[in-house]
């Protein structure tokens, strides 16, 4: 577990069996009022972060395992891949794959349980004809692979523009 520490407030640590308890107490802590429209990168409140990830490489490895499309075998997938592969150049195939995912798969998110972070397999997305950003990204990567185009999904934050290097390693920093 990695912890980023604010040295102005130290925990009282107690241990009972396999459980370690950190208790933080503060008195006379000044209140903070955030200004309207403050950029999300500028955090004015105190907070405490914990992570099970030792470094950013561990976060990347966690994500790589989630974004494994396996072998896509459905007739829908084979049909979409065949249509994309009728294009002559890699650029045309990439555009065709992107246009297919954008126009044929509705955006709909069911972010409950494992679906909050693990993409649905491409065959299921094609059968349902809907998926969230993760689902559509994994489908696009699988279609591009069938078109002979190497690609990889990436994690990103739509709200944080900077400061990631000052966060503790955690997938919670990403929302897409």
Please tell me what each predicted stretch does.
Residues 80-88, 122-130, 165:
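Second-shell loop/turn segments in exported
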Residues 1-115:
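Secretory-pathway-linked proteins and extracytosolic
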Residues 134-176:
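Hydrophobic/aromatic-rich core segments of domains that either
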Residues 17, 74, 90, 94, ...:
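Active-site-proximal structural scaffolding
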Residues 76-79, 113-123, 157-162:
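Short, conserved phosphate-binding/catalytic loop or strand-edge motifs used
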Residues 97-101, 133, 144:
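Conserved hydrophobic/aromatic pocket- or pore-lining residues that grip, position, or stack substrates
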Residues 91-94, 123-124, 152-154, 164:
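Contiguous, function-dense segments enriched for cysteine-driven chemistry
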């Amino acid at each position: 577990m990695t912890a980023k520490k604010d040295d102005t407030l130290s925990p009282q640590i107690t241990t009972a069996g396999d459980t370690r308890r950190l208790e933080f107490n503060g008195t006379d802590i000044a209140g903070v009022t955030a200004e309207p429209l403050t950029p999300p990168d500028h955090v004015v409140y105190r907070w405490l972060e914990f992570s099970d990830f030792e470094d950013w490489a561990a976060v990347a490895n966690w994500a790589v395992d989630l974004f494994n499309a396996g072998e896509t075998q459905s007739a829908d997938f084979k049909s979409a891949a065949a249509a994309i592969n009728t294009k002559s150049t890699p650029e045309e195939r990439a555009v065709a794959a992107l246009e297919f995912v954008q126009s044929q798969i509705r955006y709909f998110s069911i972010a409950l349980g494992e679906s909050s972070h693990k993409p649905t397999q491409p065959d299921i997305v094609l059968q349902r004809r809907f998926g969230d950003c993760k689902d559509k990204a994994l489908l696009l990567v699988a279609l591009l692979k069938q078109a002979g185009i190497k690609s990889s999904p990436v994690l990103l934050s739509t709200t944080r523009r900077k400061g990631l290097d000052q966060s503790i390693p955690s997938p919670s920093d990403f929302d897409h």
